[in-house]
């Protein structure tokens, strides 16, 4: 059997994942406005795909061409382009379908040719007052380097000014940094009709108001376009440059990087298209994609609901964790027993409140945290600044190389440093992706450490839409090893042994192999053996080979993979014992969890790391055992609920068909809703045991 049959290219698997996102937009059981927002999510994902995955393959082609290598990457690029074009065609079909569905509910997304006289007058006034001050045409001439001025991933209108047989060209940036993309057009009182127009179409309607009096023309035409640049950048690892300076320079490289995709309105004249491709230095390896009138569909993630409540998902108020209740402070609660939070079902407020309390608690002497992505106006980060003002020793490890969050992290680094926080940037070339918080208190018996080990970021906003686990513990063995991780970050060459935590790149590969080998050995000895894995991405060939070996030995393997999956299930004699599902729903599945049967004494681990070579060998990641039996069972229960999903689970197979899982039972189980109900009952039971009153749902 060829190696290709054992391994699905991660880029094609990623496109298959985005197809699952598109399935949500097609699902008529999903509320209408949410379906439109899934189109925005699909588009945002595809933008990132071209900036990262597509760019990487293109780079490999150019390197192979210089070195005289083979054309495997060319073949892959061709397959990627073909699949992406098919998905775009399906996207266009769904968009038109959803526009019709909205109209049936008296919501109209109109263009500039569909306005009545009263609406036209309102649009002209709105344009003159709100839009025109933000519009400055960029006139295209042979002397101007357009690439120097065009912004990555911004929507533009390419304007053709025709006079007889001559044509001038200009570019207009759609100013969504200053104005909303979707504008409600006032209707007569009493009308049920709701009319929305895109900012793009307001500009199209008023093109004459921009150019009249400055240029002579007989005809004026506008066409949508967007360019995607390569997102990679090179860092100069030189002694005289700090990492902060290197990152700032790297981001400047990204601003002027060559394009990898050019999307244009399919009605654009051929001469205009050729001229723009010439000015943008579009090569035959890049994706040239004809599209509709609108680009930057990622803005549709924030599409407004101007209709009835039923057009959106029913709210699921975040649950208050009862384990914190009845204590004077969060530290007393954590010292009593380990606490597991599962977002967004639980409120992230518990973490911001923990850090707030630590910022002024007289017993707290130090706080250490590592930051990968945080909210723009993060209360948690502001509490760290408050802690310094209150005399606490605060150390923040900021990952400057968090893709697409680099600028925000640079800005936070400056604010923290100015406030007196000890800011560390880690090791150049090795991202720090662990999710750790360590608070040290001086108590009666001496110093006591409280640790947070998580699967997701300390980000107040994404914690409302990403599912993740946070383990809070006063287990001094685990807390000491969390302290050891911070020491390792500050001095990666210092020998540190981890007995409980599994830490990349120190021991993750060897420890994961050890855990999988033990299940293989148990199966070969005739014992029951099983592996349950949940990750975002599974593409590491070494770990995939080990999973194949486990399946061949008779180990039962069940996996939940949200995104890329290069393992091929269902291969005779190789992966017959492997079942893989993927769940796409209202929340983005993000935890990394491993459960091994361990001869009847299950071990449960939560982790920040996906099963990718970069996460196992080239990043600082932390995987922690769950030692509290109560929490272990809770995580196992949550995974079990997901494997019973009959609504949102798709089966991952070698054909990447994305078929929904059919389980033969009539009862519909939507796992995310079932998990919410399960955790709600857990909190209710905990309060009952404590003799406490259940909080009102409105305050949860």
Swiss-Prot record:
Pfam families: PP_kinase (PF02503), PP_kinase_C (PF13090), PP_kinase_C_1 (PF17941), PP_kinase_N (PF13089). GO terms for biological process: polyphosphate biosynthetic process. Signal peptide: none annotated. Its cofactor is Mg(2+). SUPFAM superfamilies: Phospholipase D/nuclease, PHP14-like, PPK N-terminal domain-like. Mg(2+) binds at residues 373, 403. ATP binds at residues 45, 466, 562, 590. An intermediate of this reaction is the autophosphorylated ppk in which a phosphate is covalently linked to a histidine residue through a N-P bond. InterPro entries: PLipase_D/transphosphatidylase, PP_kinase, PP_kinase_C_1, PP_kinase_middle, PP_kinase_middle_dom_sf, PPK_C_dom2, PPK_N_dom, PPK_N_dom_sf. The active site is at residue 433. This is Polyphosphate kinase. The gene is ppk.
């Amino acid at each position: 059997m060829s190696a290709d049959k054992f391994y699905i290219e991660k880029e094609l698997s990623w496109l298959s994942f985005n197809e699952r996102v598109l399935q949500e937009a097609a699902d008529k059981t999903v509320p209408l406005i949410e379906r439109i927002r899934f189109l925005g999510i699909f588009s945002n994902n595809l933008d990132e795909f071209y900036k990262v995955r597509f760019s990487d393959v293109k780079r490999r082609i150019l390197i192979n061409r210089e070195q005289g290598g083979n054309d495997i990457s060319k073949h892959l690029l061709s397959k990627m382009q073909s699949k992406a074009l098919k998905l775009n065609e399906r996207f266009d079909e769904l968009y038109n379908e959803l526009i019709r569905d909205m109209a049936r509910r008296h919501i109209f997304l109109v263009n500039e040719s569909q306005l009545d006289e009263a609406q036209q007058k309102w649009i002209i006034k709105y344009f003159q007052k709100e839009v025109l001050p933000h519009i400055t045409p960029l006139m295209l001439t042979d002397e101007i380097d357009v690439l120097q001025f065009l912004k990555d991933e911004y929507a533009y209108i390419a304007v053709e000014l025709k006079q007889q047989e001559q044509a001038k060209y200009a570019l207009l940036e759609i100013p969504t940094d200053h104005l909303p993309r979707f504008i409600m057009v006032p209707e007569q009182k009493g009308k049920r009709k709701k009319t929305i127009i895109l900012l793009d179409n307001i500009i199209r309607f008023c093109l004459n108001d921009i150019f009249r009096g400055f240029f002579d023309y007989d005809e004026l035409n506008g066409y949508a376009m967007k360019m995607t640049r390569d997102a990679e950048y090179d860092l100069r690892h030189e002694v005289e440059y700090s990492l902060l300076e290197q990152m700032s320079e790297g981001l400047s490289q990204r601003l002027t990087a060559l394009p990898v995709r050019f999307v244009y309105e399919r009605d654009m004249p051929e001469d205009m298209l050729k001229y723009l491709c010439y000015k943008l230095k579009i090569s035959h390896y890049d994706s040239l994609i004809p599209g509709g009138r609108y680009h930057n569909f990622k803005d549709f993630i924030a599409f407004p609901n101007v209709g009835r409540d039923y057009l959106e998902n029913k709210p699921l108020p975040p649950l208050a964790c009862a384990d914190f209740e009845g204590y004077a402070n969060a530290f007393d609660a954590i010292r009593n027993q380990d606490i597991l939070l599962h977002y967004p079902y639980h409120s992230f407020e518990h973490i911001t409140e923990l850090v707030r309390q630590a910022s002024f608690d007289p017993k707290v002497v130090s706080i250490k945290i590592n930051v990968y992505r945080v909210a723009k106006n993060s209360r948690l980060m502001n509490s760290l600044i408050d802690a310094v003002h209150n005399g606490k020793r605060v150390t923040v490890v900021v990952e400057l190389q968090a893709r697409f969050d680099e600028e925000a992290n640079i800005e936070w680094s400056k604010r923290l440093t100015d406030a007196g926080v000890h800011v560390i940037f880690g090791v150049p070339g090795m991202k720090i992706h662990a999710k750790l918080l360590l608070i040290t208190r001086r108590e009666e018996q001496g110093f006591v450490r409280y640790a947070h080990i998580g699967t997701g970021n300390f980000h107040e906003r994404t914690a409302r839409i990403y599912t993740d686990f946070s383990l809070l513990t006063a287990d001094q063995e685990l807390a000491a090893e969390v302290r050891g991780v911070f020491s390792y970050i500050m001095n990666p060459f210092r020998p540190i042994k981890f007995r409980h935590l599994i830490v990349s790149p120190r021991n993750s590969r060897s420890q994961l192999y050890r855990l999988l080998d033990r299940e293989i050995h148990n199966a070969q000895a005739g014992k029951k053996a099983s592996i349950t894995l949940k990750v975002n991405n599974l593409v590491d060939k070494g770990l995939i080979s080990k999973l194949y070996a486990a399946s061949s030995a008779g180990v039962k393997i069940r996996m939940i993979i949200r995104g890329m999956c290069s393992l091929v299930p269902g291969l005779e004699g190789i992966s017959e014992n492997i079942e893989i599902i993927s769940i796409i729903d209202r929340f983005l599945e993000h935890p990394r969890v491993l459960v091994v049967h361990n001869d009847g004494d299950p071990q449960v681990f939560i982790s920040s790391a996906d099963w990718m070579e970069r996460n196992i060998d080239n990043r600082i990641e932390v995987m922690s055992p769950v030692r509290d039996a109560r929490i272990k069972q809770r995580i196992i229960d949550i995974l079990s609920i997901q494997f019973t999903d009959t609504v949102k689970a798709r089966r991952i197979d070698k054909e990447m068909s994305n078929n929904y899982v059919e389980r033969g039972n009539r009862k519909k189980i939507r796992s995310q809703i079932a998990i919410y109900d399960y955790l709600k009952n857990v909190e209710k039971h905990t309060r009952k045991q404590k003799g406490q009153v259940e909080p009102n749902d409105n305050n949860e």
